[in-house]
């Protein structure tokens, strides 16, 4: 039986720090790796929306916080539709599932049935819309979808960060890299890789998480094969 993996792609990662919302080079690199993984893995992807809109950015535009969160949710649906279009162009079978109704972009709403059916069809499953609710982060959506699809491992691709440190290595030269840690340690030391809701869900469902630099060469493949630099978080 093929292992089930859930990959988190951040919106910021999709833009690769460019002035455009999408980086074709980044997406082509990810797709090339997915093509190698599809024969041996069942793959789910949770997509962020930060390249278009962040819920926390509402004050920058003088809009209400809840409006900002809803726009952030819709941004993930746009990203999911874009990612599916890229997969289609490469003849990678995929299903886009959204936590919010958006029939013109995502024809299916996330449910246990639609998730199970997509995997039975051997599709890559793209999860958009976060949890469908404002004030919940994409991290929480990752933990929720991983639980629903019974993922064997979660891969969280960070934009330019190769794992977990005791402090921000860009601000603290004494920050130490952590190759592994438990959820209890992450929560106790307030290591802000994921929010506490997501940490708690992952811990309760005994999920393993690998944090790695999505921009590194062959990053996803190396993380899965336990090569290169990464942090493993488990119960």
UniProtKB/Swiss-Prot annotation:
GO terms for cellular component: cytoplasm. It catalyses: UMP + ATP = UDP + ADP. GO terms for biological process: 'de novo' CTP biosynthetic process; UDP biosynthetic process. GO terms for molecular function: ATP binding; UMP kinase activity. Its EC number is 2.7.4.22. It is an enzyme of class 2 (transferase). It comes from the Bacteria. Pathway: Pyrimidine metabolism; CTP biosynthesis via de novo pathway; UDP from UMP (UMPK route): step 1/1. It is found in: Cytoplasm. ATP binds at residues 8-11, 50, 54, 159, 165, 168. UMP binds at residues 49, 131-138. Inhibited by UTP. Signal peptide: none annotated. Keywords: ATP-binding, Cytoplasm, Kinase, Nucleotide-binding, Pyrimidine biosynthesis, Transferase. InterPro entries: AceGlu_kinase-like_sf, Asp/Glu/Uridylate_kinase, Uridylate_kinase, Uridylate_kinase_bac. Homohexamer. Belongs to the UMP kinase family. Catalyzes the reversible phosphorylation of UMP to UDP. HAMAP family: PyrH_B (MF_01220_B). This is Uridylate kinase. It comes from Mycoplasma pneumoniae (strain ATCC 29342 / M129 / Subtype 1) (Mycoplasmoides pneumoniae). The lineage of its organism: Bacteria, Bacillati, Mycoplasmatota, Mycoplasmoidales, Mycoplasmoidaceae.
């Amino acid at each position: 039986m093929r292992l089930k993996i859930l990959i988190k792609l951040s919106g910021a990662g999709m833009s690769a720090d460019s002035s455009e919302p999408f980086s074709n080079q980044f997406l082509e690199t990810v797709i090339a790796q997915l093509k190698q993984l599809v024969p041996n893995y069942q793959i789910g992807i949770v997509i962020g929306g930060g390249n278009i809109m962040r819920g926390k950015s509402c004050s920058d535009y003088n809009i209400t916080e809840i409006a900002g969160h809803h726009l952030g949710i819709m941004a993930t649906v746009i990203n999911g539709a874009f990612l599916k279009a890229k997969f289609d162009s490469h003849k990678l079978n995929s299903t886009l599932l959204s936590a919010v109704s958006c029939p013109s972009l995502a024809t299916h709403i996330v449910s246990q049935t639609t998730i199970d059916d997509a995997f039975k069809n051997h599709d890559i499953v793209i999860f958009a819309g976060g949890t469908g609710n404002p004030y919940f982060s994409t991290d929480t959506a990752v933990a929720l979808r991983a639980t629903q699809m019974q993922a064997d491992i979660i891969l969280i691709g960070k934009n330019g960060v190769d794992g977990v440190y005791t402090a921000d290595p860009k601000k603290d030269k004494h920050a130490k890299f952590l190759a592994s840690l438990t959820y209890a340690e992450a929560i106790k030391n307030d290591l802000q890789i994921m929010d506490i809701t997501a940490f708690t869900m992952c811990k309760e469902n005994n999920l393993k998480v690998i944090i790695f630099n999505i921009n590194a060469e062959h990053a996803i493949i190396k993380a899965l094969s336990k090569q290169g630099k990464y942090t493993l978080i488990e119960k």
